[in-house]
Amino acid sequence: MVAYENVLANKASSGRLCKALGIRLVTNPLVVQLAKNAGFDALFIDLEHSTLSLADASAIACAGLLSGLTPFVRVPYQCGMGFVQQVLDGGAMGIIFPHVHTAADARAAVDTCKFPPHGRRSMWGQQPVLGLRVTPLHKIAEVCDRVASSVVVMIEAADSIEQADAIAAVEGVDVLLVGCIDLSTDMGIAGNFESKRFRAALEAVSAACHRHGKLMGLAGLYNNRKLQEWAVHSLRARFILCQQDSNLLALGAMECAGAVASIQLDRCPD
């Protein structure tokens, strides 16, 4: 019934890794084709740390659906149920909720994403994730709740680590995604991802996920191969935000300009 694959769910079912590209700067949906060419599996469309509009997010999400890259959208903190429903109705296959501190926060996230009786999401007919097909309402609810409304909660503070087990126990939560930059900053060790305290925090989240059958994800460890390998092999992380479009442009621009600047003008023209 669902028109498009939830790559994260399918890969996770067989223990494989889902690689996401963050989009927070580029508004042209053609960025999705670049992501596909590079081998990404999913999109992390960022409405928290960007000025992307709801229309931008929908256009990029629908391009992702058509290209086989599962679109997830990070919404602004405490943006409200109405906004989340617009994002889902616009084509997102999952919502990423930042700054989840308690089990109550996690339950509210689930409540926002799922149709009754599992939540309070309002019904709408032609869903992009169902190919805009006219679909019986009970089928929309069943299919969307099962495979097209993933709930990703972000663990980004020390108090969230303390509540990781309770958060992971919430029915309907699919992924505990550690926001490494905010977490390390909140712990007073900003960017010190090698810290024993930071690693212990990640281990606590991994253990909670394993106990309750949830997926662990990581964001913010960009281009950190050593820690990414540790997280995938030792912590069983299966969802990785690999990089942001803005960082790729910045790094590529510096490399390109630096290569030209390094050319020595030591010969006079003939």
Curated annotation (Swiss-Prot):
InterPro entries, per the entry: Aldolase/citrate-lyase_domain (IPR005000), HpcH-HpaI_aldolase (IPR050251), Pyrv/PenolPyrv_kinase-like_dom (IPR015813), Pyrv_kinase-like_dom_sf (IPR040442)
Record keywords: Cobalt, Iron, Lyase, Magnesium, Manganese, Metal-binding, Zinc
Signal sequence residues: none
Catalytic activity, EC: 4.1.3.17
Chain sites annotated for binding substrate: 182
Catalytic activity: 4-hydroxy-4-methyl-2-oxoglutarate = 2 pyruvate
Chain sites annotated for binding a divalent metal cation: 156, 182
The protein's role, per its UniProt record: 4-hydroxy-4-methyl-2-oxoglutarate aldolase; part of the gene cluster that mediates the biosynthesis of the tetramic acids Sch210971 and Sch210972, potential anti-HIV fungal natural product that contain a decalin core. The PKS module of tasS together with the enoylreductase tasC catalyze the formation of the polyketide unit which is then conjugated to 4-hydroxyl-4-methyl glutamate (HMG) by the condensation domain of the tasS NRPS module.
Subunit structure: Homohexamer; trimer of dimers.
Protein family according to the UniProt entry: Belongs to the HpcH/HpaI aldolase family.
Name recorded for this polypeptide: 4-hydroxy-4-methyl-2-oxoglutarate aldolase tasA
Native species: Hapsidospora irregularis
Lineage, broadest ranks: Eukaryota, Fungi, Dikarya, Ascomycota, Pezizomycotina
